[in-house]
Amino acid sequence: MKNEVYNPSTMKRIKEIDLLKAIAIIAMVFIHVYDASPHLQPSSPIDAPFIWFIEFMGNIPSAGVFMLAMGWGAAFSSRSTPKTYISRLRQLVILGIVINFFEQYIPSIIDPATFGSVWEVAPSIIAVDIYFFAAFAMLYFAAMKGLRNKPVIAGGVSAAIVGVCFVVNAVFSFESFSTGNAWFDTFIGLFIRENNYSFFPFISWIVFPIIGYWAAILFKKATNRKSVMIFTIATGVAALVFSQVMMAVFGTSDAVVTGAHSALDGEYYSMSPLCAICGYGVIALEFVVANLIMMATKQRLAKCLGKMSKNVMEIYIAQWVLIGLLSPALVRVTNLWINLLIGIAVLFGSYYGAELYIWIRKRITESKAKRIDKSKAVAA
């Protein structure tokens, strides 16, 4: 393995993270399209392992990677201030509402007999999705930027948050509660696992952005690739072994290890302490695999997928717009391979839809800039 020198302070993007995010985007689209077809029936011997692979890649290797990369990016963002993150919080809440509109409301408007009336799904407008989680994570990043010159205090605050989250999740990981009020239950679900209203509750998942943030800070101190890989492999294997042993001792489901969907989905969505530790192990080894892929392809694959990684926000929104519009058809699909073909179409549609949106946004920005310059010239 080449022992090349790193200059982290000059790095704007880490290719391994870009590659992981791009793979996570692809897996994310396929799992969301797959989930939109609840009546799929295996029709060949290879269907079952293929379904397992889709479910596995669409869980911790996707959501966990996005959240870890979120923390990584915050640590490498030298220009951002606490105000920057508060502004992003507002933007992400608005985007979360828009996404929930397309994910929940559009199917009900198109086919209320299948998906329920708009009134019945109304609380879903604030349903937990990764954008709501990301919005609340901005509060943590704002605090870290405010404490950037006080690393000991910042580390203590981070450790305290992780400790509190682990304790809360240890108590509530395998429990659910409901008040009977869908609006209130959905709101509570933004922060803690609540019946069927939570997917990425803040207390359950904030550990991943925190790990990403501090991993990036440690990375900045690295001097060569070999030391980074050795540390990542060691901690990843240790996390997996520890979580496996503890699960064997306490008899918890191995669905936590694989990240696959099971009857105990709560173990994944509520992110129990063991699940979080195991999730870190999976992502750490993914990082090593991404490094090996880059070495084998001379970074060509990372360059090819780099644009997809940069446009993750736009692609995420575009895929939910398309899935929302296609939901009445997807819910009737029973063949896995038809679902897969639709997934491929949604992936390409999301990618090029995001590209079109970015192009339009760029042209509008340029047009506004020209008008401002022209106004200044006339005034002068």
Language model region names:
Residues 1-380:
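Alpha-helical transmembrane segments and their immediate juxtamembrane cytosolic regions
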